[in-house]
Regions:
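C-terminal substrate-binding/catalytic core of Rossmann-like NAD(P)-dependent dehydrogenases/reductases
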Residues: 204-247
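Short, flexible surface segments
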Residues: 30-33, 96-97, 187
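Glycine-rich cofactor phosphate-binding loops and adjacent beta1-alpha1 units
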Residues: 93-95, 141, 145-215
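NAD(P)H dinucleotide-binding glycine-rich loop of Rossmann-like/cofactor-binding domains
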Residues: 40-104
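Short, glycine/polar-rich helix-capping loops at beta-to-alpha or helix-loop-helix junctions
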Residues: 48-49, 130-137, 199-202
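Receiver (REC) domain switch-region micro-motif
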Residues: 37, 100, 168
């Protein structure tokens, strides 16, 4: 296979990584040789499944020091995805009250989202899980309420005796839950998704004036957006939270 493929089309794969800086460019100001950093990569460059990798300083930060390299390397992509949805797309403030529903609370992104919400906001966190082990998992992460995603979500939320969630963060199978989300979300709420539903009819959300938000953590580096440095900033804060034992 390799013999018959063009070298011009070859790509080195790999996203999440921890590494030690061995060389810096002339315009780099935030890091020095010897720094241990973590990051999630860039779609426009070769990936981390290699001994050496060139990475833009705006999308990396110093890694947390209280966990192993292997443990740290498992976090950047899910942490960036969760952070950007919660604080960039939804723009949740630290003092805001209300509730949020996370569909897929036991998954990688959902697990980080729960912890970020408990560490940095006052929102009541409702997470979905169905098996006993996943229910226990999301509870251990700090979810205030756990509901079964295989059952009627709206009915379960109503039995909790709390207001309809203003935010719904759907991490998977969004097309399965669309009709339920329309019913359970608060008027003028926000729906965020990270998966790729085959069909997605947004018209039912019009009556409630719901805003729809997609999140792809590679967008900033892919388009070299003016706020690309935000990923360095958020990874720095995530590392601080890890070292503080809050993630």
């Amino acid at each position: 296979v390799r013999k018959n493929s063009s070298e011009a089309n070859n790509r080195i794969l790999g996203w999440d990584a921890v590494g030690e800086i061995i060389e810096i460019g002339s315009k780099v100001t935030s890091f020095k040789v010897g720094d241990s950093v973590w990051y999630a990569g860039d779609l426009t460059r070769d990936g981390s499944n290699a001994e050496f990798q060139a990475v833009d300083e705006r999308i990396i930060s110093l890694k947390p020091i209280t966990v192993s390299n292997a443990e740290a390397a498992a976090l950047p992509l899910t942490a960036i995805t969760a952070w950007e949805m919660l604080f960039d797309r939804f723009q949740i403030s630290e003092t805001e009250v209300g509730s949020i529903l996370i569909i897929g609370g036991a998954g990688g992104v959902g697990s980080i989202a729960i912890q970020l919400l408990k560490a940095k906001t006052n929102l009541t966190v409702i997470a979905t899980a169905s098996r006993e082990e996943t229910k226990s998992w999301v509870e251990s992460l700090g979810a205030d309420h756990v509901i079964d995603h295989s059952k009627d979500l709206n009915a379960q939320i109503e039995t909790l005796g709390i207001e309809k969630p203003k935010y719904v963060f759907s991490t998977n199978h969004t097309d399965t839950y669309i009709k339920q989300i329309v019913s359970l979300i608060a008027p003028q709420g926000k729906l965020g998704l990270i998966d790729d539903p085959q069909t997605f009819d947004i018209m039912p959300f019009k009556t409630k004036s719901i805003s729809i938000h997609w999140e792809l953590m590679f967008t900033r580096s892919l388009f070299q957006t003016p706020d690309m440095l935000a990923q360095h900033t958020l990874l720095t804060e995530v590392a601080r939270l890890v070292d503080a034992g809050r993630l």
